[in-house]
């Protein structure tokens, strides 16, 4: 049975058994971006530390937009606790190689240079893939501003196990089609978008920032605290707001998740169609990869994305068209400043419950009207999530947000009990208890806790960042690695440079690979 044909009765028929036997066998992966900073909280001006390996080819530690913006990646694992432990090992390894530098603990950036062009782009060497990465980042800076690109976050990658899919779809693994699997993941994505505003309230940690990030706020109204701190009183995740990872240009593209064909078609249009304003940027050589709405697929901003691992120089869209959706990438998580590694088990367990609920409830196509309503909900929560008077759209009417959120969170307890019964622990029920406290008291959300502490202690955002970064450095300095980690990381450092050198010896290509299967 294809997921688009799933009825509520069918879902209810299989859900208990699936949850009991197979839901905990999912695969998880984490990616986390973090800025390297000087002891005074200013952005590091040094190149990527040689002891961390090549930022182009290291499997675990790369760089994101900026040269000092570390990007960690863990292996896909069946237990998310193992991902968190691996992320901890990567932080331990990094801290012991950084000498005097710190790892910034927030999504919103540290003290930035006065001139935007002084924010250094990631540098990846002379190979064609390395040069393309830097050119792509130069294009991002022109389109959205380098300051915006210094915002960091956590990505949570999730896929259902094959055994789970076999039970859910009612057929043998060998009989799965890529269309069925893709339809199932799109089913989840649509329902996740219907619930993401709840997660943003519970995990958003960016209501406040240093004024060097936004020297000229324009018409946006922020409160000023002391000399260098700006904040929005009820905000949850400014990272996800119009000053963060959103784009009015991208909003015009009409990219939705009602079918893989529709999604790929609109993405193909975006990566092949020039946008007039961006055309002018291409007057300078190597200013951007191309003048299209999106230079490449990864430029598209969304709280969640369907993914398939590309092979070699294969473009992500070709990978999706050839092999369908393999996993989903949740991109709506701020760095948790109260977790040394930037993410906590309870929030990930709760996110997993949302994903299961998204699968186990019917998921009709999202109309333009509903899409507008969902975006309105998310934007309201981003800016006013901790306002006790906030109302959101629920089934065509307005409801108090905190009441609706508490009710939704409690509705997941049935799943949590079954999962905990299977694992022999209370991980999922404790995750719900953890979130319920935030619904009862907005000051217990990470955004509320952070802002309250900065205001009550009368300190700057940058001071709090330095304080947390120093605490984390001390902790990572004495923590022990998992067995075999140090040798693994040292070997990967050497291997990554060898691969980088091999790439630089190859014949230089002059054009970024095109999407072969698009009709545009």
Curated annotation (Swiss-Prot):
It catalyses: L-cysteine + L-glutamate + ATP = gamma-L-glutamyl-L-cysteine + ADP + phosphate + H(+). Its EC number is 6.3.2.2. GO terms for cellular component: cytosol. GO terms for biological process: glutathione biosynthetic process. GO terms for molecular function: ATP binding; glutamate-cysteine ligase activity; metal ion binding. Transmembrane segments: none annotated. SUPFAM superfamilies: Glutamine synthetase/guanido kinase. InterPro entries: Gln_synth/guanido_kin_cat_dom (IPR014746), Glu_cys_ligase (IPR007370), Glut_cys_ligase (IPR006334). It comes from the Bacteria. Pathway: Sulfur metabolism; glutathione biosynthesis; glutathione from L-cysteine and L-glutamate: step 1/2. Keywords: ATP-binding, Glutathione biosynthesis, Ligase, Nucleotide-binding. Belongs to the glutamate--cysteine ligase type 1 family. Type 1 subfamily. This is Glutamate--cysteine ligase. The lineage of its organism: Bacteria, Pseudomonadati, Spirochaetota, Spirochaetia, Leptospirales.
């Amino acid at each position: 049975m294809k997921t688009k044909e799933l009825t509520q009765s069918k879902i209810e028929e299989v859900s208990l058994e699936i949850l009991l036997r197979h839901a905990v066998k999912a695969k998880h992966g984490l990616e986390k971006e973090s800025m390297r900073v000087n002891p005074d909280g200013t952005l590091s001006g040094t190149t990527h530390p040689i002891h961390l390996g090549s930022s182009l080819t290291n499997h675990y530690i790369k760089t994101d937009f900026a040269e000092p913006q570390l990007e960690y990646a863990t292996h896909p694992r069946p237990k998310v606790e193992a991902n968190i432990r691996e992320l901890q090992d990567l932080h331990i390894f990094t801290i012991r190689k950084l000498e005097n530098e710190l790892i910034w603990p927030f999504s919103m950036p540290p003290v930035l240079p006065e001139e935007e062009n002084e924010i250094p782009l990631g540098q990846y060497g002379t190979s064609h893939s390395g040069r393309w990465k830097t050119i792509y980042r130069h294009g991002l800076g022109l389109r959205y501003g380098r300051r915006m690109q210094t915002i960091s976050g956590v990505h949570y990658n999730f896929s259902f196990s094959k055994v789970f899919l076999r039970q859910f779809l009612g057929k043998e693994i060998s009989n799965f089609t890529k269309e069925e699997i893709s339809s199932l993941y799109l089913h989840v994505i649509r329902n996740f978008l219907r619930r993401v505003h709840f997660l943003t309230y519970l995990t958003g940690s960016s209501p406040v920032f240093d004024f060097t990030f936004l020297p000229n706020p324009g018409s946006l109204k922020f409160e000023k605290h002391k000399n260098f701190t700006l904040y929005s009183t009820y905000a949850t995740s400014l990272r996800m707001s119009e000053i963060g990872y959103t784009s009015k240009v991208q909003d015009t593209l009409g990219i939705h998740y009602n079918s893989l064909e529709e999604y790929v078609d609109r993405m193909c249009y975006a990566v092949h169609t020039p946008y007039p304003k961006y055309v002018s940027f291409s007057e300078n050589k190597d200013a951007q990869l191309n003048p299209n709405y999106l230079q490449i697929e990864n430029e598209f901003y969304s709280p969640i994305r369907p993914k398939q691992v590309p092979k070699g120089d294969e473009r992500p869209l070709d990978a999706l068209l050839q092999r369908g959706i393999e996993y989903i990438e949740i991109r709506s998580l701020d760095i948790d400043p109260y977790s040394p590694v930037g993410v906590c088990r309870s929030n990930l367990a709760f996110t997993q419950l949302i994903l299961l609920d998204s699968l186990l409830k019917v998921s009709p196509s999202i109309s333009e009207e509903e899409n507008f309503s969902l975006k309105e909900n998310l934007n309201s929560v981003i800016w006013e999530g901790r306002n006790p008077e906030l109302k959101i759209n629920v089934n065509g009417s307005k409801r108090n947000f905190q009441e609706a959120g508490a009710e939704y969170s409690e509705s997941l307890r049935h799943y949590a009990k079954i999962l905990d019964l299977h694992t022999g622990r209370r991980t999922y029920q404790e995750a719900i208890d953890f979130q319920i406290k935030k619904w009862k008291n907005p000051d217990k959300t990470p955004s509320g806790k952070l802002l309250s502490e900065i205001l009550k202690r009368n300190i700057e955002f940058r001071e709090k960042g330095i304080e947390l970064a120093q605490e984390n450095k001390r902790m990572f300095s004495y923590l022990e690695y998992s067995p075999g980690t140090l040798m693994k990381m040292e070997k990967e450092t050497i291997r990554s440079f060898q691969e980088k050198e091999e790439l630089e010896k190859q014949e230089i290509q002059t054009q970024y690979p095109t999407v072969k299967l698009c009709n545009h």
